[in-house]
Structures are given as C-alpha cells and as structure tokens.
UniProtKB/Swiss-Prot annotation:
Gene Ontology molecular function: methenyltetrahydrofolate cyclohydrolase activity; methylenetetrahydrofolate dehydrogenase (NADP+) activity
Enzyme Commission number, as recorded: 1.5.1.5, 3.5.4.9
Organism name: Listeria monocytogenes serotype 4b (strain F2365)
Assembly and binders: Homodimer.
Lineage of source species: Bacteria, Bacillati, Bacillota, Bacilli, Bacillales
Gene field: folD
Protein name per the record: Bifunctional protein FolD
One Gene Ontology cellular component annotation held by this UniProt entry: cytosol
UniProt keyword annotations, A-Z: Amino-acid biosynthesis, Histidine biosynthesis, Hydrolase, Methionine biosynthesis, Multifunctional enzyme, NADP, One-carbon metabolism, Oxidoreductase, Purine biosynthesis
Length: 284
C-alpha cells in the first residue's frame, strides 16, 4: 500500500517559513507585495484568486487585486500591467489565466517585468530555467519537486517519466528533474506503448487533464506518483489524472486529489513573491 504524500501539511510548513521571513522584513520596514489581475467573471478563476489573496495576507504580505471587465481592451490590460511594473510597492505580478479570446496571453506575459514574473512564464525566466540560471520557476513544477523530496526519495540517478508536455507543467517539471540529475522521459498523446514507458519510472508525474487516465499497469512497484490533475469523474466527484484506488496498492508514494499538488501551488507563489522582493531590494 502506497504512502500518501500530504501536500497540505508540506504547504503549511513552507508557508510558515515564508511568513516568518516576511515578519523579519516587515520589522525593517520592508513588505513584499503581490498584485493579481483578474479579467472577467470566470467563477473558477475568481475562487482561485480569492484563495491566493487570503494566503498572501496570511503570510503578512501586501495583497492587491485589480478586477477588469470581460470586454476590457488588450491595450488597457497592458497599461495596467505596465503601471504595476513601475509600482515600487509591488514585487510580484500575476495575471490570472485564461484570458478572454480577444486578448493575447503571450503579449500579456511578455509585458510583465521578468523581475516580477512570479508565475515563471516570462520567456526570460523560461530561458534561464533551461540554461540552469537562477530564475522564477513556475509554481506547480516547483511544488512537485518539493513533494518528491519530502518523501526522502533521492532524485539523482532515478528514472523519471513526465506524462504531459505543457509549458506550464510538463516541460518545466521535466527540466527541474533534469537539474536534480534524474534521467527524464517526456511522454504525451503520441507516445507509443505509454503504459510500458511509464512503468520504467521510479518517479512518475502525470499531467494529462484526463480523469483517472493512469491505471496500475502504468506503475512500477514502489514508484513515487505525482498526480497534477484536477478533474471530475462520472459521478461529478473531484479526482485526478491517476486512478488513485487502482494505483495506490502499487505505488510507494502517491499524492491524493484534492490535497496533493494543489495546496503547494499557492505556497510556491508566495515563496516566489518573497524571492522577487528580496532580489528587487538587493538591486536597489
């Protein structure tokens, strides 16, 4: 029976560490600030943003929310981002995705100052990650590495398979595993003999967006299984990309959904905001 990796507990520990560090900085008159820009009225995005705000405030940071209507022009959104780039009290900027169709996400991400790009999506940060230079790492991949390490697993020398090749999770998590000296395979919808490829993994990261896609025939006995999915099953119950009940017997360690990767994402956002603030203060 696999051991369950408690993402909530780990997220809480990291957040407490961030909060302590912020408290020390506040004593020196320095307060990290995070601005979130929300366009339109997508309920899922709104809930997620509210959660981010709450956690930012709990950590003792300044939290700013800028809400814009669904029909806002791209020009107006870009000018809001430019203003935040110039704002000395804001150290992290996050534009909540997805954006309405008439706005180019790429253009918006490119406009965020890479020093304040706490999501780690700016091309400069992506490039720095791939050449091994210090950068802001996307929050979910950063959280995944922390979850793997929390099991006591030595990543170096292990076979890791990442199923999914998105720019937000798949590619960056593969790069982070490579930096940790794992031997990495990226698998995707065109991969032949996928169960067989997955079964070679000591560490398996699944980010397919398909409910309960991975079954126990994908799992090497004792593997660390990280489920990035957030789906609904046929009964409308929250589940992941891994069929948890089927896989839990084979896995050595496994993240649950909910309560695995999810809680880590916001925590790593706070860690990135703290890092951004410290960097900006150091430069000035």
């Amino acid at each position: 029976m696999g051991e369950i990796i408690d993402g909530k507990k780990l997220a809480k520990e990291i957040q407490e560490k961030v909060t302590r560090e912020v408290a020390e900085l506040v004593k020196e008159g320095k307060k990290p600030g995070l601005a979130v820009v929300l366009v339109g009225d997508n309920q899922a995005s709104r809930t997620y943003v509210r959660n981010k705000q709450k956690r930012t405030e709990e950590a003792g940071m300044k939290s700013v929310l800028i809400e814009l209507p669904e029909n806002v022009t791209e020009e107006k959104l870009l000018s809001v981002v430019e203003e935040l780039n110039e704002d000395k009290t804001i150290h992290g900027i996050l534009v909540q995705l997805p954006l309405p169709e008439h706005i180019s996400e790429e253009k918006v991400i490119d406009t965020i100052s890479y020093d304040k790009d706490v999501d780690g999506f700016h091309p400069v940060n992506v490039g720095n990650l791939f050449i091994g230079k210090d950068s802001f790492v996307p929050c979910t991949p950063a959280g995944i590495i922390e979850l793997i390490k929390s099991t006591g697993t030595q990543i170096e020398g292990k076979r890791a398979v990442v199923i999914g090749r998105s720019n937000i999770v798949g590619k960056p998590v593969a790069q982070l595993l490579l930096i940790e000296n794992a031997t990495v395979t990226i698998a995707h919808s065109r991969t032949k003999d996928l169960p067989q490829v997955a079964k070679e993994a000591d560490i398996l990261v699944v980010a397919t967006g398909l409910a309960k896609f991975v079954k126990k025939d994908y799992i090497k006995p004792g593997a660390v299984v990280i489920d990035v999915g957030m789906d609904r099953d046929e009964n409308n119950k929250l589940c992941g990309d891994v069929d948890f009940d089927d896989v839990v017997e084979e896995a050595g360690f496994i993240t649950p959904v909910p309560g695995g990767v999810g809680p880590m994402t916001i925590t790593m956002l706070l860690a990135n905001t703290l890092k951004a603030a410290k960097r900006i203060w150091k430069m000035n």
